[in-house]
């Protein structure tokens, strides 16, 4: 389902709220929501440190919640909104979950799996391709990451 820019902005703001939860826990602040028919069916935020599990990325949490909501591993007719470009692992999971549309805020130059380093979501060699849109609220999404890294440097300096 195509969403207007106003609707897309609302959903990305919801993803930013999820990222803020991670920031409050000193986790890398990435947030994600999955939307179907205008309703958020999955939410997630980074929780690797808290859970001691490497796979507890925002997208993975949101996919798990959306799978439970739908009672199906296939998340057809959904859109995933995430504050930072999905990493390689999350891009693979997005494809496996059959999510057809991803909208992200800021690029991930270090480990991006959608555009920056790898193009997993659009690779024609794979059996599922995803429509990718980038740059929605990019400055806001980048700013929360910059805040996290600035706070980390301050903690190191003061310890």
UniProtKB/Swiss-Prot annotation:
Keywords on record: Hydrolase, Metal-binding, tRNA processing, Zinc
GO MF annotation list: tRNA-specific adenosine-34 deaminase activity; zinc ion binding
Keyword match Oxidoreductase: no
SUPFAM superfamilies given in the database record: Cytidine deaminase-like
Cofactor(s) required, per the database record: Zn(2+)
Reactions that this protein is recorded to catalyse: adenosine(34) in tRNA + H2O + H(+) = inosine(34) in tRNA + NH4(+)
Function: Catalyzes the deamination of adenosine to inosine at the wobble position 34 of tRNA(Arg2).
HAMAP family associated with the record: tRNA_aden_deaminase
Record protein name field: tRNA-specific adenosine deaminase
Lineage start: Bacteria, Bacillati, Bacillota, Bacilli, Lactobacillales
């Amino acid at each position: 389902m195509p969403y207007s820019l106003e609707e897309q902005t609302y959903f990305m703001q919801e993803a930013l709220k999820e990222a803020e939860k991670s920031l409050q826990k000193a986790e890398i602040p990435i947030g994600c929501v999955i939307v179907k028919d205008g309703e958020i069916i999955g939410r997630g935020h980074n929780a690797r440190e808290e859970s001691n599990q490497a796979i507890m990325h925002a997208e993975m949490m949101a996919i798990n919640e959306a799978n439970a909501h739908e009672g199906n591993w296939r998340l057809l007719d959904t859109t995933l909104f995430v504050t930072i470009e999905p990493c390689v692992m999350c891009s693979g999971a997005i494809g496996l979950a059959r999510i057809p549309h991803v909208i992200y805020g800021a690029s991930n130059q270090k480990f991006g799996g959608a555009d920056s380093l790898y193009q997993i979501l659009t690779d024609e060699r794979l059996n599922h391709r995803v429509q990718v849109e980038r740059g929605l609220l990019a400055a806001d999404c980048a700013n929360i990451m910059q805040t996290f890294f600035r706070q980390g440097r301050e903690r190191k300096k003061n310890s």
